Amino acid sequence: MARALGAEVTVGISYKDGKVTKDSSALTIKGISAAKKSLTLSELHTGESGLLTRMMIPLISMIGPGKVHITGEKTLTRRPLKGAKEIMGAFGVGLVPDEAHESEEVFVPLTVEGCVNAGKTEVSGSGGSQLISGLLMALPFAEEDTVIHLKDPKSIPYLFITMDVLKAFGVKVWCDMEGDKEFAESQDWNDCTGMTLHIKGGQKYVAAEMDIEGDWSSASNFLVAGAVFGRVDLKGLDTRSLQADLSIMDILMEAGASLSQLGDDDPKGDIHVQRAPLSAFEVDANNCPDLFPIISVLAAFCQGTSKIGGVGRLANKESDRGKAILDMLLQMGVKAKISGDKMIIEGHSLAQRQLTGKMLRGGSYTSNHDHRMVMALKVAELGADSPIVIDDTDCVTKSFPTFFELFGKIINK
């Protein structure tokens, strides 16, 4: 994507303290000194990434020529961009899909028309944080200041990650959070009812050096595998992270997992998890929907009835993920149902399943071309009565190309 926008990207070279060194994990990007309407491209391809699409819509409407065609592929073209038309319309930008749909939502491919207007605007955050993050990235290029009042915000931690990254590149954005007395006492994201985002206009991005954190979403699959079936040690994670999926640690602790971090108060110390008796848990996953598949598998091995909120956030993922998870659990022989916005799962400990012979059912399963479902299925296979055969495993490369290699190493230890 950086190259498509005109940036120069060098892989395997690091520049630090005036020295050039080889580093296979490094990316060096020479930017394009973007400014309002400085970009001349007419078409942008975002692959299968909903995140990239939603972030790029505000950006290219700000720095693009005023009319840019966005294309995608595979599941992206079947997934509605919930709330995008309404939100971008509030900023004076039109989204025109190539084909008409019965839904009021828009789909890729589409054309982005117009330039983002600064000012005071109120929009809904119920569709998620990705488009809002794109606006936070784009609006510093505007001449005037912007204030966005976000009603019913979701995936709030991701907005704080965006603001943290912007700060690293010299851009000032800040927010006020709203909620009732319960929020004031709990400071729980799920109790927040609104946010007011303040973006100064006329800003410029400055080059910066960044270390990319380990990904808690990917790590969650290994943590659950260790908590249920054996032991796992993970390196490269930061327990001070703003990532929403750090919540997996709280969920595992509530379930009774044996967790520890090596090092004297070192937030980047190795994470150790090992098998322990697990009990049912209750969690609101509205702010960490990517954890839903793997914590559903976790719930199947927790004694008692677990309740996971946030099913409504799953409809427009790579699959209708709520339905896909429920179908997977039922096929495995797990008692589960969706009630309102919650998934209710009747679990049994691994020890009880082994004692009674009621392991999860193996066999042929569909991933629904969803990378997170593939990873959850592979973890579930560890507690199945026969191998689980997944129809499409290639989709896992979207977020974790080396998943099978690393997972295999852990299983063989």
Task: Outline where the language-model segments fall.
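Short, structured segments at the rim of ligand-binding sites
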Residues: 1-413
